[in-house]
């Protein structure tokens, strides 16, 4: 359970790239609400899938289509915002609060993130033991802790990266690369879902 949770949480994805970029631009402290929202949002998604939502998806598979489309739109929007970011690194100057990702955006991003749904459905299938819900409760608890720590590590990495990117146009170039990557990841996940 720990290895599965770690491999899914620490591997690059839309949420991780958003945390990396936000922490580079605004610091971990400013990004912490987004990290918390993403962790709690995913934990609620995982618990919902573990304890019944999976059956609803089996009955109404079109729900995954809707989630994939909405998720792609959300990820494209976030990617465009990162792409257009000025490329400033952490400073003592006041931040533009409107550009710092919020708790709600973190939670919503997980519910609309195809990678999160894949992790939730795969983990539920892997660790489900029939009618013994205690195993799934342990899985959800382990995933919560591992997810929080993994996302926090991405935030710390972004903050550390800021010192390297504080020269010339490196921060702006980094935002362009991260924005383009997030856009490409979201389009690729949508493409793979509909045309695999």
Report the location of each language-model feature.
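Juxtamembrane transmembrane-helix termini in multi-pass membrane transport proteins
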Residues: 1-65, 122-139
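Selective transmembrane alpha-helices of multi-pass membrane proteins
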Residues: 59-88, 147-150, 154, 162-196
């Amino acid at each position: 359970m720990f290895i599965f949770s770690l491999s899914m949480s620490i591997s690059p994805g839309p949420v991780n790239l958003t945390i990396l970029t936000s922490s580079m631009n605004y610091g971990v402290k400013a990004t912490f609400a987004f990290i918390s929202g993403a962790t709690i949002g995913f934990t609620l998604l995982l618990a919902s899938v573990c304890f019944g939502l999976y059956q609803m998806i089996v009955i109404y598979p079109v729900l995954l289509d809707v989630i994939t489309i909405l998720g792609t739109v959300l990820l494209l929007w976030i990617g465009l915002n990162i792409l257009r970011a000025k490329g400033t690194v952490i400073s003592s100057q006041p931040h533009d609060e409107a550009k710092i990702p919020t708790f709600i955006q973190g939670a919503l991003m997980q519910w609309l993130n195809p990678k999160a749904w894949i992790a939730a459905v795969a983990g539920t299938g892997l660790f489900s033991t029939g009618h013994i819900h205690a195993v799934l409760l342990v899985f959800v608890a382990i995933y919560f802790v591992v997810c929080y720590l993994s996302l926090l590590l991405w935030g710390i990495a972004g903050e550390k990266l800021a010192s390297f990117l504080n020269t010339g146009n490196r921060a702006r170039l980094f935002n362009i690369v991260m924005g383009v990557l997030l856009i490409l990841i979201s389009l690729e996940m949508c493409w793979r879902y509909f045309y695999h």
